[in-house]
Design a protein with these regions (language model features):
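Non-catalytic protein-protein interaction segments used by genome-maintenance enzymes to assemble
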Residues: 3, 7-92, 110, 115, ...
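Bacterial replisome coupling helices
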Residues: 65, 74, 78-192
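Single conserved hydrophobic/aromatic residue that forms the stacking wall/gate
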Residues: 1-9, 190, 197-199
Length: 199
């Protein structure tokens, strides 16, 4: 699996990440974990060719690992780690578990995300009946992850463009060439990730 996106993510400036678009997508992914984490969203073949059910939690964890990514917010990382630890516990329901969590900060985040019942997606059938998020997890969760990753790349490309416009860098041919090379590398990583997922 490509580790390029992880490198892109780690290179970004730390300040003000909460205001960036990818942080909003990160929050949407965590919202899906809180609401539907234990739900089975698809089946995948294991190494022996057997179909195994994959929960929302497991899908997100595996998808992040593929690109060497982690969530920026420490509480989001903790939610995902604890969710993965307990996903196979008998009777585990992510929303109930996190809302009743002993850590008040974590419980507060979970309560806020669970109580915001804005539908993450708006899928309509031919009868114009609105299909709920839970019925479309196999489409919704991969889309949330793609949007999250796309936003990471977009933020990095924007950061490079600002650096290229800096007069100090403009006057330094070597620095300029290095930035252009980095821009191409990030764009290529982004393109390869898209090709891998569309095949």
């Amino acid at each position: 699996a490509s580790r390029g996106l992880g490198d892109v993510y780690k290179r970004q400036p730390q300040e003000g990440k909460e205001g960036q678009e990818f942080y909003r997508y990160e929050r949407l992914v965590i919202q899906a974990i809180i609401r539907y984490g234990e739900k089975i969203m698809c089946n995948m073949e294991d190494e022996e060719g057997k179909e195994i059910p994959v929960s929302v939690i497991e899908y997100v964890v595996n998808d992040l690992k593929e690109d060497d990514l982690a969530f920026h917010n420490p509480m989001h990382r903790r939610i995902l780690t604890e969710a993965m630890t307990h996903v196979h516990d008998s009777g585990f329901i992510a929303e109930r578990y996190f809302i009743a969590h002993s850590d008040p900060e974590l419980s507060s985040i979970a309560t806020e995300l669970a109580s915001d019942r804005y539908q993450l997606s708006k899928f309509h059938s031919k009868t114009q009946k609105i299909t709920t998020d839970e019925e479309r997890l196999f489409e919704l969760v991969p889309l949330l992850m793609i949007n999250f990753k796309n936003a990471i790349v977009a933020a990095e490309l924007k950061h490079i463009m600002y650096a290229l416009q800096d007069p100090v860098n403009e006057a330094d041919d070597e620095k300029c060439a290095a930035l252009m090379q980095r821009y191409k590398a990030v764009s290529y990583t982004h393109l390869r990730a898209h090709e891998t997922r569309s095949n």
